[in-house]
């Protein structure tokens, strides 16, 4: 569970600080105030911790994070994420399951995050997903082609990770409780079910 999360100098957000979060939290604000950027930053950090030392993953955490930020925000250099005109760095501090993870970088940063510290010695034992505003089921093949084969900007990592997660067939005995409950609640709320035809992509 996220115990604490703060960001300094991310785009329009000079300071965002959350403490004492519950299992479900709501972020409300008018359009154009940087809500999505904050959530994408949180997602990129959590997904990087999830990937770090997972299986035979050889890369250092800061390398995984830098690449995740690049493909999530789709910027030519990481320094573009820093609030324009600010002399101080973009800084992120996260306390997750009582373990700390923090990093920072300035406007001149290209692709490498040098200043970072983490209490995580193994991968974060959870899965996170970001559900973007656009519908992805019918675009899944285009998203995979654009990113996996052509390595082009257009669909950021939030889309790609969601499509990959949806592609994984459910394994016998691996019907996670949270997902099962979520599907049941959605079915009750919508009075129906989602049926996806892999052959037609609809």
Sequence positions of predicted segments:
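Pre-Walker A-like glycine/lysine-rich segment at the N-terminus of P-loop NTPase domains
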Residues: 1-47
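Phosphate-coordinating catalytic segments in nucleotide- and nucleic-acid-processing enzymes
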Residues: 6, 48-202
């Amino acid at each position: 569970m996220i115990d604490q999360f703060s960001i300094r100098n991310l785009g329009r957000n000079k300071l965002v600080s959350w403490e004492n979060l519950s299992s479900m939290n709501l972020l409300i604000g008018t359009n154009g105030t940087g809500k999505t950027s904050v959530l994408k930053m949180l997602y990129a950090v959590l997904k990087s911790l999830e990937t770090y030392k997972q299986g035979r993953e050889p890369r250092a955490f800061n390398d995984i994070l830098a690449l995740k930020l690049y493909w999530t925000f789709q910027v030519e250099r990481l320094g573009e994420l820093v609030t324009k005109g600010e002399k101080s760095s973009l800084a992120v501090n996260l306390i997750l399951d009582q373990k700390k993870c923090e990093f920072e970088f300035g406007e001149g940063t290209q692709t490498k995050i040098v200043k970072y510290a983490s209490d995580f010695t193994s991968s974060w034992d959870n899965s996170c997903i970001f559900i973007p505003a656009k519908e992805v089921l019918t675009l899944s093949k285009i998203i995979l082609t654009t990113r996996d084969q052509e390595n082009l900007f257009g669909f950021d990592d939030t889309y790609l990770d969601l499509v990959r997660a949806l592609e994984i067939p459910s394994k016998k005995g691996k019907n996670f409780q949270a997902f099962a409950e979520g599907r049941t609640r959605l079915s009750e709320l919508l009075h129906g079910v989602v049926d996806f035809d892999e052959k037609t992509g609809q």
